[in-house]
Swiss-Prot record:
Keyword Zinc-finger attributed: no
GO-annotated cellular components: extracellular region
Keywords noted in UniProt: Neuropeptide, Secreted
BP terms from Gene Ontology: neuropeptide signaling pathway
Localization, UniProt: Secreted
UniProt record similarity statement: Belongs to the FARP (FMRF amide related peptide) family.
Known function: FMRFamides and FMRFamide-like peptides are neuropeptides.
Protein name as annotated: Extended FMRFamide-12
Recorded superkingdom: Eukaryota
Length: 15
């Protein structure tokens, strides 16, 4: 899961 630490996917995994 590259989206876990990807700042570009901020609206995806970050709470």
């Amino acid at each position: 899961s590259p989206a876990l630490d990807d700042e570009r996917n901020d609206n995806f995994i970050r709470l």
